[in-house]
Amino acid sequence: MPGIRKGDTVKIISGKEKGKQGKVLELLPEKGRVRIEKLMLVKRHQKKGRSQATPEGGIIEKEGTVAISNVMVLVGDKPVRREKIKRELGAKEKARADRRKTAK
């Protein structure tokens, strides 16, 4: 899985929502997509009685998905790329910016 986790703030770098930022709500690794809060909104037509949340049915707006390749993780206000680094032991490991330190 690329260096993206649920709860990360990401920036869309390609597509109709290019340049916008949001928080990752859900990862779909088998499809290579992410769902981002309040971005890529799609409308779904819900039949009456299908769900407890909408017993009357109607048209529901919810977040669509974006390809993982079209988003970058933000640290502070800057997008960052992850890199492979060599540790002292010589093992390669995927690395990303330490979000926990910069978030405080």
UniProtKB/Swiss-Prot annotation:
Residues 85-104 are annotated as: Disordered. One of its GO terms (cellular component) is ribonucleoprotein complex. SUPFAM superfamilies: Translation proteins SH3-like domain. Pfam families: KOW, ribosomal_L24. PROSITE patterns: RIBOSOMAL_L24. Keywords: Ribonucleoprotein, Ribosomal protein, RNA-binding, rRNA-binding. InterPro entries: KOW, Rib_uL2_dom2, Ribosomal_uL24, Ribosomal_uL24_CS, Ribosomal_uL24_KOW, Translation_prot_SH3-like_sf. One of its GO terms (molecular function) is structural constituent of ribosome. One of its GO terms (biological process) is translation. The keyword Ribonucleoprotein applies. Transmembrane segments: none annotated. Residues 85-96 have a biased composition (Basic and acidic residues). CDD domains: KOW_RPL26. The keyword rRNA-binding applies. One of two assembly initiator proteins, it binds directly to the 5'-end of the 23S rRNA, where it nucleates assembly of the 50S subunit. Belongs to the universal ribosomal protein uL24 family. Part of the 50S ribosomal subunit. This is Large ribosomal subunit protein uL24. The lineage of its organism: Bacteria, Pseudomonadati, Myxococcota, Myxococcia, Myxococcales. The gene is rplX.
